[in-house]
Amino acid sequence: MYQAIIFSSAAVISALVLLLCRKHENCRHNILKALTVIFCTVGFVRFFLSDSITYIINGGWFEGVRYEQTDFFNVILRWGYYTNYAVLTTAVFTKNRFFRNMAGYFSLPFSILSAVYYEDFMKYFLDPTGKGYHLTPEFRYAFFAAELALAIMIPIILHVGDRHVFNFKDAKEWVAYFLGVPAVLLVMTPVYATPSFLGTNNLAPQWFSPYHLIWIGATFVIALIIYYIFRFQSFEVRHSVCLFFVLVLFFHYNSLYLMGLTLKRLPFQLCNFAAYTFLAAFILKSKKLFHYGFIANIVGTMFAILVPDFGIGYTGFWNMHFLFEHSLVLIVPAICMGLQIFPRLSKRSMGYYFVGFSIYITFCYILGTIER
């Protein structure tokens, strides 16, 4: 029943928007942007709701319990669907052809598949062992159905309304697509995917072990690769790439709430706060806010990278979250300044460091979040 509601509502709303706005391009774009913001908001809220997917481990330990259960298919579905949050938003708010191609030819098929296998998701959402807020089954069914309908209609309206099609005769477009999609999947790897595919263990990585050094090297190499690939591209392309990474950081951090909402997980620690600061700087186009976020975060980020607080399990949930978040907190401002989306730091900007750090210390002292 819910699959029929998802597909019919997506079809009807898409048709209405396209018909009513067929002669009003700005109207269609504004509606599309509004639908995208609603979609991201719904997805953001869903991270706070119960979900037991974190317990799907390919033979490994988690919080003192060994799990043998695997569900590769659902993890793959989720992985593909998870790209919607950053890909659809970037595709709608910019005119980058790669992200628009990915929205229509990758994200849309995964959204349709997710709707077809709707019950596979609900099994984990309604599992009593899941962390997060447990709400009524009726609400969870309707809430996720609405999210899926939005995920389907957004790329349809975008592609049909703008008459966007893949340029099959352009070799560069093929290369960009087949290199770009794996890159997007890599940086948007859900933290529950690695234990699902690789399993985990009871071992904790050590400082400056091969595990640690590979992570440090990969972080700087990725930042340099992004810079050298896009440094001579148009402002529109550079802006869309940086916006994408800002969104990746934002949704990666908030996926942490799959493990439940606690005071310590609120965005008051600086690396967590950066996820909100950088996004706000993009929305407001505020270089002061961006510099504030960068300067206030850089000391803590470098400290976390060089002297990491590793947990148990090389590929476990918490270690993957730690690695991805701190890499992104370093990469995002580096490429934003390197690609000249925001100006590089001036001496005057250094004053924001003291403001940011003072606010951080105050929040940590009041809320007791200095400890992880």
Q: What spans do the regions from the language model cover?
A:
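Short aromatic-rich membrane-water interface segments that cap or initiate transmembrane helices
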Residues: 1, 63-79, 131-145, 204-214, ...
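Membrane-interface helix-boundary motifs at transmembrane edges
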Residues: 20-35, 91-103, 161-172, 229-241, ...
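A glycine-rich, hydrophobic loop/mini-helix early in the fold
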Residues: 35-72, 234-279
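Aromatic-anchored segments of alpha-helical transmembrane domains
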Residues: 40-48, 106-120, 181-190, 247-257, ...
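Hydrophobic cores of alpha-helical transmembrane segments in multi-pass inner/ER membrane proteins
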Residues: 6-18, 77-91, 142-160, 214-227, ...
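C-terminal membrane-adjacent module
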Residues: 118-200, 341-372
